[in-house]
Structures are given as structure tokens and as C-alpha cells.
Amino acid sequence: TVVQVTVSKRLKEGSYMSTLPRPLNPESDPRVKAVFDDIRASRGSDFINNLWHYLAFDPKLLEDTWRDVKAIMATPSSLDPVTKELIYAAVSIANSCDYCIHSHTAAARAKGMTEEQYAEFLSIVSLAGRTNHLLNAIKVPVDPEFDHT
């Protein structure tokens, strides 16, 4: 498939060298299977992405991570789903997490993000990066009006 070819190409290029092997049959562990089943049910899809496969080496870590992701990203809240994904993508850009940038940009698109919205998002990320660097270099003092007391 396209995903396998892309992953294989990236692995050959050496850009995605995991520090752990991908578990071969993670669902043989009942705790992992329960999490994977909940991911499938929550997303309405049979696709389990690499993040979850790799975290399956430690069922407790997998359970804890999915619990938090589900509570924040997959539960209705005051933020709409596209906004949540774009916030996650912006933080992922700041943290240089290539996997997260790709997965959350894809999730934002799947949840209805338009190309116009993506272009605006990238403009904001670019502007924030540039002005953050400028202000850090200049060491501009914070206005007292911005302090929360």
C-alpha cells in the first residue's frame, strides 16, 4: 500500500529509526487488544496507527496515553475538532515531532480543515515563530497589563 511504501522509503532513508521494535502481534495481550478495540470504536475505523502499535510494548503506557488522548482529543468540548488538531500540530511543529505534525495535519483534514485554513494556520505558525525569536533576542519586557493577577 501507499502507507507501507512511504514508511519503507522513510526507513531506508534513515529518517525514522525507532528505538523500539514494532510489536509483531500486540493484540495477543488482552490489555492491548482492549485499547485497540476502543481506538477503533472511538474513531469508527479499523486503522490503528503506528503510535499505538509502538506503545503496545508497555500496556500501561498504552492505556494511560490512550485515556488522555481520548479524553482531550476525542471528547466533545468547547473547542471544535479541527481547532484541537491544529493546536496539536502547532505544538508538534514547535517540538519538532514529524510524526505528530503529519498525523494531526491529516486528522485536521479528515475533520474538515480546508486548504485555506491550513494556509492561514501555517501563516500564524510562521509569524509566531518569527516574532517569538525576535522578542527572545531583544528581551522585551512583558507589559504589566498582560500579567494575570
Where are these regions (language model features)?
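Acidic, Ala/Val/Gly-enriched low-complexity intrinsically disordered segments
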Residues: 2-7, 13
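Hydrophobic alpha-helical segments
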Residues: 10-149
